[in-house]
Amino acid sequence: MSLLNYPNQNGEVNMNTEHNPYKRLAERLDTLPNGFPPSDDGSELKLLAKLFTLEEADLASQLRIILESSTQIAERLGLEHTSTRQMLKSMARRGLIRTGKMDDGLGYGLLPFVVGIYENQLGIIDEELARLFEEYYQNSFPIVLSIQPSIHRVVPIGESIKMNMQVAPYESAAGIIENAQSWGVQDCICRIQTRLIGKPCKHPVDMCMVMSPVRDAFANSNEIKPLTKDEAYATLHRADQAGLVHSVSNNQRGDWYICNCCTCSCGILRGMAELGIANVVASSAFINTVDEILCNACGLCVESCQFDALTVEMVASVNGTRCVGCGVCVDTCPDHALILVRRPEEEVKPVPVNLLDWGMQRVKDRGIDITPLL
């Protein structure tokens, strides 16, 4: 379907009409497990209009979760093959849609807005995009953050966990690094976004770690700085020293990034500190404990905790309902009085096996049907 006649005579687009391709794309994105709920002020449509042309939004609104070749998409939608392929390639190059290898070439599919489209705009984010995202964040993001299972899961660095304790690879940041073949780091779009809207935080920007099961995966990237495994560990320790919380995608297999987060800029953790949503991030399998003999009540752990999970009177004490098991406080204790131990089994939420399992659980929690996307 051509959109050349869609705008009115003044070149304007009516954002409220049901025929608006941005509205249809927003509705399509909201059928994904991640969610992209409508706002009261139409900020989600303005966001999409900033990133997609009308024609691109129309095409993207008809993509599926599963990958299809450009030929399959063109034939399914009754579109001209060459122009369809060029438009799909352009959107994939800008991180607006998903792409991957198929037996007969490249395939294309629908990509969530978060985590997905938005994070891919690291190279082009400006003040306008930052402010549009903030409008949407304040208006509708609480819905996204309230859906279970959570998008992110906290993992400790590994050294903060009690020795001789069995730890699955997906339960610690070190285990995730060890399972990769390539490592890299890039700037954090969350901290760039808050800086652009005039609310910068003190934490370092070059903190988003990415991994891959493929060797030399980031050798030709313009935005990702390739790292050796040792450099990846050094970056993790640098984040730890900055008091940042390590979080990953909330599944056991396919953890290919480690976000090093703060409650002042991180889109996920701000949900807890700023929006008051309790379960924005899944806790780790561990909880902090205090050795009352070693503790001298200095209070450094209280200052380092981003979740207000510690208090000090005669000695430090832990609020188990607020502690997410990140281990940040463990490294700040000069007397080594803190250590992470495994939570009681009944308190540990099962971690989804993979992205599909995670998605199906969120779909069930939302009560939506994703059959039209398959």
Stretch-by-stretch model annotation:
Residues 320-374:
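Flanking helices and flexible, charged tails adjoining ferredoxin-like Fe-S electron-transfer domains
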Residues 108-110, 247-253, 275-325, 343-346:
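Ferredoxin-like iron-sulfur electron-transfer modules
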Residues 95, 243, 299, 308, ...:
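Glycine-centered, phosphate/nucleic-acid-interacting loop/turn motifs that mediate DNA/RNA or nucleotide
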